[in-house]
Amino acid sequence: MAKISKRRQAFAAKVDRQKLYAIDDALALVKECASAKFNESIDVAVQLGIDAKKSDQVVRGSVVLPAGTGKSVRVAVFAQGEKAEQARAAGAEVVGMEDLAEQIKAGQMDFDIVIASPDTMRIVGTLGQILGPRGLMPNPKVGTVTPDVATAVKNAKAGQVQFRVDKAGIIHATIGRASFEPAALRSNLSALIEALQKAKPATSKGVYLRKIALSSTMGVGVRVDQATLAAQ
């Protein structure tokens, strides 16, 4: 732990918390700070100009990152008949109906995302207290309740990330791994920012994207100059 603290302190000394770094410089710093023995995730925190306490200003959605997330995702799908076959063909690891619900109730949840066809919500709806706290409850706002389950599975496998603003008005998301090339991280960040812009509430006033900061799992936050991101 002491070594980690010393390493973190050394990286913190390299980063000016008050400075806005050009996107390329920010990514270089973040990748340099990602020196752990595992392939650290590269995360972004975006401070939004919204009032998260107001229901009409809750920002939520999903986006497929063009360079993927660097993570292998296991998908469970509630579907039957032809849609079940389509889900399996698209690569879903687990497909079912009441049998899948029973597995979940028994605590057997070896998957990272749950997708549901609308006609299965009578079953899925009974699992809210189990799936909800784990962030697994299907929701049409993030594309996980859809009649096109095959596309939803493909998107999940291709690197789709879900986002939802927290109580402080901040969006937290992972845009890749430390092993990614800077260009891949840049394209993923741009895709996320574009999705956030599209999800801007009509009632949001003033500056919408207030602050953007990047960090690695074990690193420190580096603030990004948004003008340089827009110039990419």
UniProtKB/Swiss-Prot annotation:
Top-rank taxon, per record: Bacteria
InterPro entries the UniProt entry points to: Ribosom_uL1_bac-type, Ribosomal_uL1, Ribosomal_uL1-like, Ribosomal_uL1/biogenesis, Ribosomal_uL1_3-a/b-sand, Ribosomal_uL1_CS
Example GO biological process: regulation of translation
Disulfide bridges in this chain: none
Keywords of this entry: Repressor, Ribonucleoprotein, Ribosomal protein, RNA-binding, rRNA-binding, Translation regulation, tRNA-binding
PROSITE patterns noted in UniProt: RIBOSOMAL_L1
One Pfam family matching this protein: Ribosomal_L1
Gene Ontology CC: one annotated term: cytosolic large ribosomal subunit
Keyword flag Zinc: no
Similarity comment text for this entry: Belongs to the universal ribosomal protein uL1 family.
Purpose of the protein: Binds directly to 23S rRNA. The L1 stalk is quite mobile in the ribosome, and is involved in E site tRNA release. Protein L1 is also a translational repressor protein, it controls the translation of the L11 operon by binding to its mRNA.
HAMAP family recorded: Ribosomal_uL1_B
Protein name: Large ribosomal subunit protein uL1
Organism: Burkholderia multivorans (strain ATCC 17616 / 249)
Source lineage: Bacteria, Pseudomonadati, Pseudomonadota, Betaproteobacteria, Burkholderiales
Gene: rplA
